[in-house]
Amino acid sequence: LHNCGSFLNLNDIGENSYKIVTSTEIIGLSHQERMIVAYVIRYTTGDFPEYSEIKNEFSREEYIKIAKLNAILCLADAMDRSHQQKFTNFTVRKRGYDLTITGQTLYDITLEHGIFIQKSPFFEEAFGIRPVLRQKKCL
């Protein structure tokens, strides 16, 4: 769903995805829930806005929920950036302030690791823990 805007135009995918979600009824979601989904996917490619920029549309609690969901989505998208499903299994461990995500793969994950590092600071800001991506080579 977060990449649905790419079917309209490869420029500004997040904004196009936002427009598709806001203009489409999604069975089982209220209008406000649909707006939350739209804002989560809107900022997967750009900078996440400050609360003051969208405070007329969401409460502070909703803003925090959107920010956290966006941070999770951005890391998940980074781990499959090439859209080749290079990882087969994941383990997640939290030690201190680190959240270590270890994925099993034999493939080169240079692209995924680089994007993961770019997206990590926002996740750390949203959750207060530092995400770390590790590769476990397996046969």
Question: Which residues does each predicted region cover?
Answer:
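A short interface-forming secondary-structure element
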Residues: 100-114
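Divalent metal-dependent catalytic cores for phosphoryl transfer on phosphate-bearing substrates
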Residues: 1-92
